[in-house]
């Protein structure tokens, strides 16, 4: 009853309730043409054959022993957004799209699954492991340091569908699949194609987007194909911040009255990007086929930051008399290529492949200074840092069906995998990290007395995570894995699948064995139950092991206040981190249970409900920032400035996540009024911390630490795991088709989120919100479609931060939906 307690008030004040009512009525409406439905119509998605979730023979979605969601190309394109990450989050209730609004992390948005960070969901392309990004996660809700996959480097135009396995699958696919698997299936075929142009912008006038997309197929040899896809997009920047409350100029300066009080421009960066993809197959004979795919992406970003005030020690008035907004510039290059062969021999189906992927992120700045160099500082830097991640994967898989072995149908699959990966960082220009020792003079350039006289200027290029030679790293490792998978039908209604996987890492991650048992029992043609029990693991990312950086931007004080600070992430094996109690990282281990039902209660109606339980031991998190006078002797002994805020990665928590996924689909036929496909999705999840590791001995007994913090992992890090993601999410939609006219309506409710700080007084809560999207399309001449639409059409914003910073930063906190407000767009597409 509590769920509907405020319904009258919502009906009066929130126009979104109209959208919800429309969807709800459609879901309750009986199918008017039910008596005319064929058997095929009565089983939605029965013909959708999938390749994710079970080794061996392919199965349909409704026959899968594990929960699978299918996202089609048409659904992705109708979200109205240019990036694959946000499109997925809009369509699936168990996924949430985070927004990092500062620094280089604002170009890669975290896609959480079942409240677990992106690193716990494995990404495949055509069933093969996708390489990771080079950038460690260090953003708003995910500061784990893991480098997850950047799926925005895959063009949406290349996607035929996405198969989402909502189940732990480490025993089948290896490390990282604790929360599930995203399998991107690329378009194939020698015929057909699509061209599209989209233009749109935010209601505020910012964030202007222009996008071109296209794909087409060609014949290749005798019976083969080559399918090409490309996207190109340009997005303007956008920001959402409060006006600053502090002063920009020294007392008595008349310029203070005319300052616009824009203390920060954090938000969406300006982006120019293009992505290319191909997918090809070439039969050699009746038994053997060669196949290959590749993707290439290039993304250039210009990222704004908070204002360097004229009266601050991060500004040199001879260079910027009125202060400046530093820029982060990113040049991101990403590619992956695969070649393989598949066929039949001696009664076995075999598949042999090799794939190589690389992500290279080069950072520079068109506008910043190193204040410690004084007026001699450059005002731009061509090289601040470079991050690179490489991955080479080799697979051989075999599978065979036995009809009479042991008297029951049996599917046997097995395989071997070798994976090599390397993470590297490269230092930038020496002047960017040089300590120049500049002190402010007694007078300002205008001849007036300088209130900063004698003070040291800030060190290093501003708004930049500069890598110096001492911070560079080069780590690599090999992983060897073997798996077996048995699928058996002991009696006709029951299917059981057992998978075992053994892995060896040649670094400290060591050896591990994972197991998974799936089963499905079909009581009738329309009702079945399924269950899962298994174990999994995730090896520490190379970025979590070896990433090292010094950053001179800001830090979060115990009460959540954003303050200027020099922060440093120390690698766990460094002398500095170990002096502060760090130890080598252990792999994260998981246990999981799942139980679900699939039901088709009426023609053209389907329902799935899946409950899950995931327990993860030794979760890796970044410690809180450690700083203050009590640490001065330790820092000084390591040659580190005693004012530095230091953190590192550690196995800090054991957690338990429990939840429920419900998906309902229904198709209504209204005769002359057309057809409507209704959908409803719901996710509930709750993560609790069941154990917090003790602080290391090195941090205990240090004595008084006035003005500092010795909290190893506290409420802030705990909150990232337990409260930063909404515990509930509803996705309700209806797609109406009447001849050439189409209307697609979707409304999503994001539950409340909370940001915790070390001091409870700094906690912030952000209420639940409904976000509604609408697209109207009309097809001309059978192949040209015009569309207009909007996302967040009612311009709903997150609740404002109750404790904003003096510079106006972090207006909306860590919203689970895009905080920039309403966005409208128009699109023209040509299909052939």
Predicted segments — roles?
Residues 324-337, 356, 368-494, 694-731:
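Outer-membrane beta-barrel transmembrane domain signature of Gram-negative proteins
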Residues 57-60, 88-133:
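Extracytoplasmic beta-strand/coil segments of soluble accessory domains associated
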Residues 191-194, 204-318, 322, 326-345, ...:
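Transmembrane beta-barrel wall of Gram-negative outer-membrane proteins
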Residues 616, 686, 746-756, 777-832:
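C-terminal beta-signal and adjacent terminal beta-strands/loops
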Residues 48-79, 134-142:
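N-terminal periplasmic "start-of-domain" segments of outer-membrane beta-barrel proteins
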Residues 128-166, 214:
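Short acidic/polar hinge/loop motifs at secondary-structure boundaries
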Residues 36, 414, 600, 606, ...:
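Gram-negative outer-membrane beta-barrel transporters
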Residues 84-87, 91, 111-112, 124, ...:
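N-terminal periplasmic accessory domains that precede
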